[in-house]
Every structure is written in structure tokens, then in C-alpha cells.
Amino acid sequence: MGPALAHLDIDQQRFAWIPEDDFVNHFAADLDPVKARVMFAVQQPLPWSALGEVMGVPAWKSLPTWFLVADGDQAIPPAAQRQFAPRMGATTVEVSTNHVAMVSHPDEVLRLIKTGAEAVAAAT
């Protein structure tokens, strides 16, 4: 895990929360700080167990896959993302962004989603 997740607050119900400083400066580092603070204020916790549980058979084993590598991600290291994508056989794009690419680079994310949707539609 990267610095965005280095200081998680785990509550009594075993939910993980990202502290404000880490959220603004690492998790959503390429956003305007005001927008990042709004996102921090409305964040939903992640069950702590989710970071270590095996979730069953991954869909990428049987379905076409597209993957966006966020080369400035401070939550999931970009090197790990670059390793995951080929293992999945994913069509991959790399964007200079942080973990919240869907907010900071919505056009690039939309383009990747459209590419995947069009490829699947053409194959059926």
C-alpha cells in the first residue's frame, strides 16, 4: 500500500477510514484541496477485512478487461498496477493522475469505458 493508506484509522466496528491529511495530500492529491476535503468529508469506510480477503474467482479470468494505470497513485503503487494489468490480459492505458482518476481525469476514464463497451458490443 502507498502513503494514502499508511495511517488508516480503524474504528470499533473494524471499518477503515483515511485520515484527512492523507486523503487530501495522497489519496486525492491531484484534485483541488477544497474538492478533496469535500470528498474526505463524505468518504465511506472500507471494511478492514476487505484488504486481505480473497473474493472468489476474478471476472477477468473469463471476461475481456480494461485497466487504467494511475501513474501517480499513492494508494495502489503504479508498479503493482503495471504488474496486475498484463496478468489480467487487460487492454491498458496509463494516465498521469492519482487514485481518483474518475474525478480528476473523467474524460480519459470515459474514453477507456467507451472503448471497452464498444469492443464488447462489436464482439456480440
Can you annotate each of these PLM segments?
Residues 61, 66-69:
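Short beta-strand/loop motif that positions the catalytic acidic residue
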